[in-house]
Amino acid sequence: GDVLVTPLQVARFMAAIGNGGTLYRPQLIEKIVGPDGSVSATFAPEVVGALPIQPDRLKALQDAMVNVIKNQRGTAFFRIGEMPIPAAGKTGTAESSIPGSPHAWFAGYTFNSFNGKPDIAVAVIVENEGEGSDFAAPIFRRVLEAYYFGSPQVLYWFESGFGITRTPTPFGGIPTKTPKP
């Protein structure tokens, strides 16, 4: 039968895998800061459950998800394997109601607090587009680059079709011209 899950539910599940099994209530606001810089309210994370998994199996799952990105045989290696951000994830390709046009999924999380920022979990779905490794995984990488570096670091092959003609400036460098497809 059909599996009905939202990207938020998948991201929450990824966060729990990454943090050792704790499920938190999703929240959008950490604190409220006034114009003078004073904090008028803070919102602590709320634990609402735990994943029903043994620690050794959770560790095996985490290791497998790192290999999806870092192992040359991993499904996301060729799209995001050289990314410097420590991350783990899973590609997915889901059937759609349009024959030959599956939904592309990628979900994952970061670890080791890269660049001094807190870890995050992200779920990406690109409907009716293709394989998760081809379309959703590069978007996952883009989200991480925007979060940790403030801008994307590479231009993907499919972006030239959107009218993007220059590679984003990596770490303050000079952008380069993108070849025509």
Predicted regions and their residues:
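Ser/Thr-rich, Proline-interspersed low-complexity disordered segments
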Residues: 161-181
